[in-house]
Amino acid sequence: MAEKRDYYEVLGVSKNATDDELKKAYRKKAIQYHPDKNPGDKEAEEHFKEVAEAYDVLSDPQKRSQYDQFGHAGLGGAAGGGFSGGGMSMEDIFSRFGDLFGGFGGFGGFSDMGGGSRRRVRRGSDLRVRVKLSLADISKGVEKKVKVKKQVVCSKCRGDGTEEANGKTTCQTCHGTGVVTRVSNTFLGAMQTQSTCPTCHGEGEIITKPCSKCKGEGVEIGEEVISFHIPAGVAEGMQMSVNGKGNAAPRGGVNGDLIVVIAEEPDPNLIRNGNDLIYNLLISVPLAIKGGSVEVPTIDGRAKIRIEAGTQPGKMLRLRNKGLPSVNGYGMGDQLVNVNVYIPESIDAKDEQAIAAMENSDSFKPTDAARKDIDKKYREMLD
């Protein structure tokens, strides 16, 4: 599966599917491709991982929101995250979602995958970083690197948490399963419930000789430089995940994610409005009267535009496709040039004579039609 399919397509649901619809769709697909049902079938195993990856994203509100905004790019797939990219093993999938198979012909547990154990796989906490982007970065997309201080696998025990190879013993409370079973009598008959073992906290083992460096936690504080791609068109406050680049989990669990929060740097010339960019152009009175050409800054450099003779203050010119791309890859914004006329606060004697001559010219006297046009524009603004 060289190219990732749409997650909604993988599960066979619509983009407004509810949590219950997602769960039902995942159960159906997972049972169809379950390794117990398709022994030795590598293609079925890949489909099984694919539906698990899709459900992992769509069942998490934050990840689903990121996916809906950015697609696969917003989940940090290029940085090595996800199931098929090596982020989670088959055992991790069963541990995380195994309870969803209950009542379906015995699927669930670990069956042939893990010797009947249901030990809990811990997950490391997520990290958050704020990344500042210029409009130029946002217009094209950009590769970024951040250096973070985080929990990493202990360099001495390699995450095992023990001082030596035989530093663990099987938990006597749950006998290594990670869960305890309780049977209670009710008016409906005997009811069996399972819960995480309180002694080993779901790990199935007790550390008897903890690592002297990490004190048995399996993690230590370290630093890592993380690279990731930010797609074009992102906006202030948007978030994306880099899978598996958060804190390491204690004793061999699954890493958390790195949550990248987008921050826009103010541009000295351009103002963003959605996918459009606005430039406030100030022209002289003679240019507004006679017309002419002028250069304006754009996201790609400078562009020459034509000012028509008699241009009024507040006129908006549009440069097609000179704005920002849509974050989902469809469509491009425009650049709007808001034309304003500069009125000097003071003038010299020579200019006063020129203006005095203008005052007596009918060309410079406001017309009733011009006043009505301004009135119309204000009414449209108020509606």
Swiss-Prot record:
Matching Pfam families: DnaJ, DnaJ_C, DnaJ_CXXCXGXG
Induction cue: Low level background expression induced by oxidative stress due to hydrogen peroxide.
Keyword Repeat: yes
CXXCXGXG motif repeats: 154-161, 171-178, 197-204, 211-218
J domain residues: 6-71
InterPro entries: DnaJ, DnaJ_C, DnaJ_domain, DnaJ_domain_CS, HSP40/DnaJ_pept-bd, HSP_DnaJ_Cys-rich_dom, HSP_DnaJ_Cys-rich_dom_sf, J_dom_sf
CR-type ZnF: 141-223
GO molecular function terms noted in the UniProt entry: ATP binding; heat shock protein binding; unfolded protein binding; zinc ion binding
Note accompanying the cofactor annotation: Binds 2 Zn(2+) ions per monomer.
Subcellular location: Cytoplasm
Keywords noted in UniProt: Chaperone, Cytoplasm, DNA replication, Metal-binding, Repeat, Stress response, Zinc, Zinc-finger
Subunit structure: Homodimer.
Known role: Participates actively in the response to hyperosmotic and heat shock by preventing the aggregation of stress-denatured proteins and by disaggregating proteins, also in an autonomous, DnaK-independent fashion. Unfolded proteins bind initially to DnaJ; upon interaction with the DnaJ-bound protein, DnaK hydrolyzes its bound ATP, resulting in the formation of a stable complex. GrpE releases ADP from DnaK; ATP binding to DnaK triggers the release of the substrate protein, thus completing the reaction cycle.
Protein name: Chaperone protein DnaJ
